[in-house]
Amino acid sequence: MKKICCYLILLSFSFTFAQNKPTFSVVGNAINKESLLKNKRLDVSKIKVENISNKPIFLVWETVSNTFPKEWDCSMCQHGACQIGIPKGSVFSKLNPDQQGFIAIHVIPVNKIGNGTVKFKIYDKANPAYSKILTFEVEVL
């Protein structure tokens, strides 16, 4: 009976730790810093992520903060879709093993000098305990 209890405890710990194992990683840096002139545009600033598991995953992202000036014209793209503005969140299209996806932003400052930061929390839908913060810092001169 003691052996069975020990095995059950060991099995429950292994399930807990197995689910916390990362299924994706950030390719390169999780922080992008961009600088541009007020009469120019930021065509794309992209942060890539990669599925490092052996099965397909669905990454969820949420906007944690957004301090971009309201005058700036912004949009963002995720793996599988683009949206006007900086939405509150969404889900990537399926990422197969070893496949990369991304979050990207586009900024047209409309001659408005300033700076702003947008941060996205990203995690696997099946493993929300493991997450990363992707940060875009933009300065318009």
Model-derived regions, located:
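Short Pro-Gly-centered flexible turn/kink motifs
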Residues: 43-45, 93-106
